[in-house]
C-alpha cells in the first residue's frame, strides 16, 4: 500500500523566525536522492500553500514542510499551531526519538488532534534502551554525550 506522506522536521534553533540557512529544501533534495523518488519541499509549514499541495497529492507522493522551528508556536507547544499541523493529515507517526521528550507542538501538541503512533526508529530505540536497562550484557560501558549532556 502506498501512502501520501507529509514530513516535518526542524533544523537548528531559529527561535521562531525564518533563517535562510536553516531552510529544509536541501534536506528534501538529499532525501529525494536517498529514496530515489521526488520529495516536494514546501516554503511554508501551514496554511493555504500546504493545504493545496496536500490536496493535490496522490499515493506515493512525499511532501516536506518547512522548518517547524520557524514558527514561534512550535517550541511553545501552541495548541493552535498543533491543530494547524494536524488539519491536513489523517494520522501522526512520531519517529524522532531524540526530540520525543520535548513538549513541542509537533511532538506533543499534535497528538491531541490525531490518531498517533510511534515509528519504527523510535520503537527500535525504546526496545534497545529497555534491553540495556533490564538485562544488559556484561561487561557494560555507558557512554553519554551530546551538546546538552548536562540536561
Q: Which residues fall in each region the model found?
A:
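Active-site loop-to-helix "anion-binding N-cap" substructures in soluble metabolic enzymes
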Residues: 1-151
Amino acid at each position: 500500500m502506498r501512502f501520501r506522506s507529509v514530513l516535518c522536521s526542524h533544523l537548528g534553533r531559529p527561535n521562531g523566525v525564518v533563517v535562510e540557512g536553516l531552510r529544509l529544501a536541501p534536506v528534501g533534495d538529499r532525501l529525494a536522492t536517498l529514496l530515489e523518488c521526488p520529495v516536494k519541499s514546501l516554503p511554508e509549514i501551514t496554511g493555504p500553500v500546504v493545504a493545496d499541495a496536500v490536496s493535490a497529492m496522490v499515493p506515493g507522493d512525499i511532501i516536506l514542510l518547512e522548518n517547524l522551528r520557524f514558527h514561534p508556536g512550535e517550541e511553545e507547544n501552541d495548541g493552535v499551531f498543533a491543530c494547524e499541523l494536524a488539519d491536513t493529515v489523517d494520522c501522526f507517526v512520531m519517529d524522532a526519538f531524540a526530540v520525543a521528550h520535548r513538549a513541542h507542538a509537533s511532538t506533543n501538541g499534535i497528538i491531541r488532534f490525531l490518531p498517533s503512533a510511534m515509528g519504527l526508529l523510535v520503537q527500535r530505540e525504546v526496545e534497545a534502551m529497555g534491553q540495556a536497562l533490564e538485562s544488559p550484557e556484561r561487561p557494560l560501558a555507558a557512554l553519554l554525550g551530546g551538546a546538552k549532556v548536562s540536561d
